[in-house]
Amino acid sequence: MSKTKNTKQVMDQYETEAIKRWGERAESSIELWKSYTNDQRDLVLQAMDENYKVIAQLMHEGASMDSPEVQERVRIWHEQLYYFYEPSIEIIENLGNMYKNESEFRNYYEKIDPELPDFFGDSIAYYADILATKWIESQVLQLKE
């Protein structure tokens, strides 16, 4: 089974789980995703799969979760989320936790690499902390103006 086909199956699982958890917000995300052509969706899913593989490769090459190379890949993942919805820092944090701790997500990433769920989840947590810090700093600057 191709990785893209695997990703499509996971997307179906995401849809079901998302509607249960987030209701209307999830439904609007699904509507956005379904507005793309099949070719557009395939390209997005292929790019996402490739990004996961690169993260796993970097991990095996000894890169740490906070390395510039890994964080660039997490930034790319963050950008890819916009194909589905606008991800808040909280959503990003929650996704990282879900990838590590929830079996349906963990199983998907383990198929790419058994160590990927923990590494990717930790990398996402680090990225989210950086985003949160930058946001707080921007708010402090605004208050000083």
Which functions belong to the PLM regions below?
Residues M1-E145:
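Amphipathic alpha-helical "stalk" segments
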